[in-house]
Amino acid sequence: MGGTKIKIGIVHQDTILASASIDSYSGEGLRPRLPLIKEIVDKLLERAEIPITSVSGLGISSPGIVDNHSKRILSVDKKFGDAPDINLEEWCLLTFGIPFFIENDARSALLGEWKYGNAKDADNVILMTLGTGIGSAAVTEGRLLRGKHFTAGIMGGHFVINYKGSLCNCGNKGCVETEASTWNITNIAKSEKSFTKSRLADFPVIDYELIFRLAGEGDAMAIHLRDQSLQAWSASAINLIHAYDPEILVLTGGIMASSAHIIPYIRKQVETHAWTPWGKVDIREGKFPATAALLGIAHVVNNG
């Protein structure tokens, strides 16, 4: 479940047999989307010719702080604000009659890359997602980090990189997610004095696809926003590296459609500024930018 889209899939091992994507309307809550989610699941099962009795379970990859033991969403950051009040396991059992599993979305994406993708079989990995928000997750010494209160590894989007920065949805100021993610980039752009001189002013909604495209065409404001965001993401990557001591950093998410610009920039900044006397962190693009979380939550369903 993302801030912009909800992806739904039927997965067998590391293969997605059928999938669909719907608008999340996350600001309106999760409960109104549950009937449509059921409808899509039923259609996908029919398309794949799989009876519900053959399904191992249903897994949800959710933003926010997730207790995978009690199978509850504990806290969310504006997206799907009603989710902590919903007993999703009960909904799953009543709706489908199959076991239910849940995990944080960034952890799910990391599981997908760690088990099947570009971090396969590594023992120390961090993943950073660049999308509607900024997410992170970590594998240390071969273990997926969750922590006593289920926040270990996933707070990368809320590392402070500008203590005088804008107020974040989490209540802090200057989080990397506030400084450089899709949900706030329109506000950032419109706050710039020279915004009206930019072609960006012709668009009611600004995203990174537009910013990178106009930057490539020489728009000064787009170049400024692109470079400012690259610096913010690099600072976040370095913070994650210093916090979790990985061998591999995987970058994924919708913004990675511009990976040809993002990967070289972050790699150079990490090599220049990260304190890693043992050597260089291997920075890789995710193998499954759109489906890693589906594969990861399927792994949770199949392995508990």
Question: PLM features: what roles do these ranges have?
Answer:
Residues I37-L58, P99-F100, S194-L200, A237-L249:
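Phosphate/pyrophosphate-binding loops at sites that engage ATP/ADP/AMP, CoA/4′-phosphopantetheine
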Residues I6, L94, I102-A106, V160-R199:
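Glycine-rich phosphate-binding loop plus the immediately following alpha-helix
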Residues F101-W114, M256-G304:
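Glycine-rich phosphate-binding/hydrolytic loop that grips phosphoryl groups
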Residues M1-P35, E39, R72-S75, L144, ...:
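Short glycine-rich, Thr/Ser-proximal phosphate-binding strand/loop in the N-terminal lobe
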